[in-house]
Amino acid sequence: MNNLVDEGIAIPYSRLNFKFDAAKFYENYCADKSQYEIISVPSNMLFNISGSVVPKDFWKTPEQFASIAKAFAVMIDGKPVSTAFTSAKHDDKLEIGIETHKDYQGKGLAYLACAKLIEYCMDKKLEPVWSCRLENIGSVNLAKKLGFIETLRMPYYYIPK
């Protein structure tokens, strides 16, 4: 595989898996929601969100999402600017997906949306799950701020078309 990397055919990445630590979540908890509206997002609104990590990439229909999953969004001027959603659910585990509009990144809004989804998980006795690419520094840092601890690092290769 190294020849493919050297020739620029394959791109090496690493996937990180995290485990949730509720004590760390509350230790770092700083969700000042007073200045933002955070809503439970209707499933039909979710399928209009654009970006690289969006619900329509994980769920076949809004109805399927509504029957299994949950999402919360930070709203500004009536629009969802950061949305945390169920990207997968199995038994008592709920994997979190997050998408923040590029104009609103770096403002702590993803933290607020994810914290709300984590609170929902805890109320429903679900274990929040997080995974991302090592190269996605924003996601790695957000996971740690939310109380997740890295448990597994898996290298893989991507071969663009």
Model-derived segments and spans:
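Conserved active-site alpha-helix within GNAT-family acetyltransferase domains
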Residues: 2-3, 111, 134-152
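Acyl-donor-binding surface of acyltransferase catalytic domains
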Residues: 1-45
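Conserved acetyl-CoA-binding loop-helix of GNAT-fold acetyltransferases
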Residues: 96, 106-121, 141-145
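Conserved catalytic-core motifs of GNAT/GCN5-like acyltransferases
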Residues: 10-20, 149-161
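Short, conserved active-site entrance elements at the starts or edges of catalytic domains
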Residues: 46-72
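A conserved beta-strand-loop-helix scaffold within acyl/acetyltransferase catalytic domains
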Residues: 63-71, 75-93, 97-102
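Conserved GNAT acetyl-CoA-binding A-motif
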Residues: 121-133
